């Protein structure tokens, strides 16, 4: 498994994980927090079916929210783990909130289901700006994974005791099934750039992985489009635009309906929409299989690094 193939968790895969987790752990009772390394936090929840563990990571190239198998008990003594343990003690996880096309998840905690939230754990999946923060009932930061000082960001400094400031709003357009084909095409061809850049610059929620899926996804009805992310928009034929828009609409329908299935591909990446589910899942949930995907890739990366250091 090549370390270079690790796929970043994008908006689409985050939505898939949240759909899966809501069915499993909402509501559930918080029990345990531990920090196995400097870039992730593991949380244990008691459900009607037993314990479920989540991993929240703010690692720049592998920021993620996934389910994991029961982990080794390690890292409960870190400052962040102790702050989260104290802040969430005797509370229930009552909601997993994610707004629009933002890669920000709000885990809401209350004394019991049906009561107002009194603590919020925020996970921001934003590349090198990723972070995790615990907020009190006044939305003040009581614990933070990565302090952001004034000299690091004049726009959005983040420290314990500060009011929580959400990330700046996304500047591009939110994709919509209601947008007419002609307008969609016109926006993407307004500037003579490659297709990948046109999609990312014009619409929210677009990742390199999604771009590849939109243009090369195996379909039951059509051969894969002979396009790449580097294809100039002015060289795309009318028929290709129609096929691409069909894929675009399929993707948006999956987001709207919350229908996702996980397929791991031979190149080391994965997809969560518009493809048959793997037959090798052994009944494991989508969020758990993604947790294993990231664990395996990151373990492989560590082994490769260690072997190179020994040479």
Label every model-predicted segment.
Residues 1-311:
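Extended, highly charged segments
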């Amino acid at each position: 498994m090549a370390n270079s193939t690790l796929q970043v968790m994008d908006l689409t895969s985050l939505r898939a994980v949240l759909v899966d987790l809501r069915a499993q752990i909402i509501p559930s009772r918080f029990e345990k927090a531990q920090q196995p390394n400097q870039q992730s936090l593991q949380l244990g929840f008691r459900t009607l079916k037993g314990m479920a563990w989540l991993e929240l990571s703010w690692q720049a190239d592998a920021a993620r929210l996934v389910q994991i198998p029961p982990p080794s008990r390690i890292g409960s003594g870190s400052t962040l783990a102790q702050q989260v343990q104290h802040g969430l003690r005797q509370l229930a996880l009552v909601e997993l909130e994610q707004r629009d096309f933002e890669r920000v998840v709000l885990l809401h905690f209350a004394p019991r289901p049906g009561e107002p939230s009194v603590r919020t754990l925020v996970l921001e999946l934003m590349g090198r700006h990723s972070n995790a923060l615990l907020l009190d009932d006044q939305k003040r930061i009581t614990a933070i994974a990565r302090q952001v000082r004034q000299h690091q960001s004049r726009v959005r400094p983040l420290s314990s005791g500060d009011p929580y400031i959400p990330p700046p709003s996304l500047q591009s357009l939110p994709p919509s099934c209601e947008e007419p084909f002609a307008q969609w095409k016109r926006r993407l061809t307004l500037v003579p750039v490659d297709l990948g850049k046109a999609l990312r610059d014009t619409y929210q929620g677009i990742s390199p992985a999604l771009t590849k899926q939109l243009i090369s996804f195996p379909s039951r009805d059509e051969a894969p489009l002979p396009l790449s992310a580097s294809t100039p928009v002015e060289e795309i034929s009318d028929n290709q635009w129609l096929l691409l828009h069909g894929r675009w609409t399929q993707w948006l329908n999956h987001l709207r309906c919350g229908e996702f299935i996980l397929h791991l591909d031979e190149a080391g990446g994965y997809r969560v929409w518009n493809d048959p589910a793997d037959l090798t899942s052994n009944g494991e949930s989508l969020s758990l299989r993604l947790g294993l995907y990231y664990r395996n890739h990151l373990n492989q990366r560590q082994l490769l690094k260690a072997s190179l250091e020994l040479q």
